Amino acid sequence: MLKFLTPTAYASHHVTPATRFRSTPVKNLLFKQLTLLTGWNRSSYELGRRSFSSDLDSDTKSSTTTVSAKPHLDDCLTVIALPLPHKPLIPGFYMPIYVKDPKVLAALQESRRQQAPYAGAFLLKDDASSDSSSSSETENILEKLKGKELINRIHEVGTLAQISSIQGEQVILIGHRQLRITEMVSESEDPLTVKVDHLKDKPYDKDDDVIKATYFQVMSTLRDVLKTTSLWRDHVRTYTQACSLHIWHCLRHIGEFNYPKLADFGAGISGANKHQNQGVLEELDVHKRLELTLELVKKEVEINKIQESIAKAVEEKFSGDRRRIILKEQINAIKKELGGETDSKSALSEKFRGRIDPIKDKIPGHVLKVIEEELKKLQLLETSSSEFDVTCNYLDWLTVLPWGNFSDENFNVLRAEKILDEDHYGLSDVKERILEFIAVGGLRGTSQGKIICLSGPTGVGKTSIGRSIARALDRKFFRFSVGGLSDVAEIKGHRRTYIGAMPGKMVQCLKNVGTENPLVLIDEIDKLGVRGHHGDPASAMLELLDPEQNANFLDHYLDVPIDLSKVLFVCTANVTDTIPGPLLDRMEVITLSGYITDEKMHIARDYLEKTARRDCGIKPEQVDVSDAAFLSLIEHYCREAGVRNLQKQIEKIFRKIALKLVRKAASTEVPRISDDVTTDTEETKSLAKTDLESPETSAEGSTVLTDELATGDPTESTTEQSGEVAETVEKYMIDESNLSDYVGKPVFQEEKIYEQTPVGVVMGLAWTSMGGSTLYIETTFVEEGEGKGGLHITGRLGDVMKESAEIAHTVARRIMLEKEPENKLFANSKLHLHVPAGATPKDGPSAGCTMITSLLSLALKKPVRKDLAMTGEVTLTGRILAIGGVKEKTIAARRSQVKVIIFPEANRRDFDELARNVKEGLEVHFVDEYEQIFELAFGYDH
């Protein structure tokens, strides 16, 4: 079968059969236009005469060896059909094809020998089931198509092609005119022979204005394309050297404009697809064919413009880059000649060596080796390469780290204690533990080997304590938060192969602080992100916080071991439950339980008030906040364990006072002179001066202000003498009575609901994230009846607390059977147990003994003793087990004026460790059996 070259290959050359001509003047308009476009002239006549001959010239007596002139084109009514898969053959152009079928090739050679060297070239139709873009698919289709199958797959309209030459399997075809298949002649499959009709253009008026206008538009568009595309200019030169001779011949014989040739030429040299070219080939209306060609050529103009703009932009970019590179090299060469600055590579190398030379003996050997290798590599790289920037950044990080540079630690315990007391009030147990740590460091000469974790509610000063430890030890301080951190690269850095890669937080820390032994505060470690596609940050923290591993900590970016064993790590967390076990095991946890009321009072008076007053620009003599106001603020507005909310409320008070002071100052200013007064006379100035004088003037003429600020708040006026001038200072008094004017209505009410708890009601103690609180347990009857005993529980209780209520019900029934067997309350009564504050979720086992006491109080119809509170987990046998939050619960009891507290015996040690001011005034009983609680709660005199 046939194997065809690609359209690019066969479109790069084209010829048409040419005719001889005499020395006739050039009058054809088409020839004139093409001559202007290509620069062709009559001197090309000899070249055209030697290259081509015409089969239409009746005066021609001989022909060249390429084209036989004996047969006439109109006599070719039966031809061999050759399928063209990629593009139709346009008249006036030639196409090389490969014929592999021996039968077809022999038939073509036989046609040439019989001096009838013509065949029909027909475009192959697309097959929807095959990939038209695949050459191998096309070859397979051509091999399978035979006879009727082939004629059904080719277009009816094709081109009469002259067989110009046959060399091996290559056949050169030259297009002449359009053909239409009428019927198939050969019955055999190969070669396919068909009968054809020669198609002629429809008659047209050569003087028609519309056709002329279209013709000129095509010529104008061709001129635009030829200005931008050299390939098209080559096409036109070749075409005019052949086609123009034919046009002169036509002028001599018929004397008409050859518009069809222009349409064929434009379609043939355009980059149109095969369907568009086939449409031009099949169109016999000359005007419509010119319009189709005009559309194709205009598309080519647009494509060429886009290509030209892209090429121009690329050229400008590269020329600009080349210019900058050349100028940069020239500048470097000039600097070298002048003996000034060296090139960038030398300057960078000198900078890096200047960093490491003074500390070369302190840099570890493996790190120094890497630095030397990278410096050698830097000299071999081009400054314009991306690897150069990567190497520079890497060397910059390696050489800027504080190799061998340590802060001189201060292990003076007295100085550290003073600093801790200056920064924080209370927290004596925490301070004691920190001082122990510093003392051990002083004896050992270093404070390495410990990872401290400060655990406690928000606002208790965990972060500020870490900063105080750094100040006490004279270490540099660095803080970073890991809350929500899910990317391991934030801790261990990115690989250098990534764009924008950076080291991890620890390497950045060492660079920022400039020492190898800073104090690093890792905040919110209990909120560390979970494992994801970026790795497991908790596992990465293990290497960082393990004293046995962080001596050789490997950052992904630096890729060299770094010694972090001298770094003191302090972590903070609100709770330790969410910290992974292996990570928590490497820490020494110090619990900050929060501040009691007395501690908050001191903090508010000695720290927060002074800071807020200074930040608001208020003098001490302008505001006086009473202790009662601070106490009310703590108990009714800020019950959390920390002091952060207390600080906000104090700042709110001072901001409102600052606003009042500014408004007062603005209202007492002397009004300015009206804008409509343009000039001041001496009389006016004298009157103004007189008006400004005070009614009361000292002997020396100094003014004494006596006006007082008229506000609704209690104020007092004090006079201060400064030299000879007396000023009136207004002082705002803030006490419990007017506190709500500054901070709004109280948020919390009194926890103590009853002066004397009624029957069935007992006060318990609970722990919350805001500290401790009191908790009432209430029990009452629902209905009585034989065998209707039961218990209904409400109060938004958790599963553990519901189980505690069931246990309490069982234990209470057992105790009543022992104490009063005749009492059938639990057997015949349905009871309802409720825990107030139903919107607040509650859970935990520590209210077990309180629930038993509430049930027994109802059964005995006897209230418990006044000012009693209790807490403790109870078992079915009546044993009292340990609970948590002893300090917080004790503080809550004091806040509710409780005098007697019952704790489990197992918590005696926890209570003994409390500060004296926390335990003062409390009667505390420690029990391990409920029988002891029964005696304390009900064994009293009415």
Curated annotation (Swiss-Prot):
Residues the record lists as binding ATP: G456, P457, T458, G459, V460, G461, K462, T463
GO CC annotations, alphabetized: chloroplast; chloroplast thylakoid membrane; mitochondrial matrix; mitochondrion
Biased composition (Polar residues): 695-705
Lon proteolytic domain span: 756-940
Membrane topology: Peripheral membrane protein
Chain positions covered by the region annotation Disordered: 673-725
Composition bias, Basic and acidic residues: 682-692
SUPFAM superfamilies for the chain: P-loop containing nucleoside triphosphate hydrolases, PUA domain-like, Ribosomal protein S5 domain 2-like
Active site (UniProt): S846, K889
Remaining remarks: This protein may be expected to contain an N-terminal transit peptide but none has been predicted.
Protein family (similarity comment): Belongs to the peptidase S16 family.
Protein name: Lon protease homolog 4, chloroplastic/mitochondrial
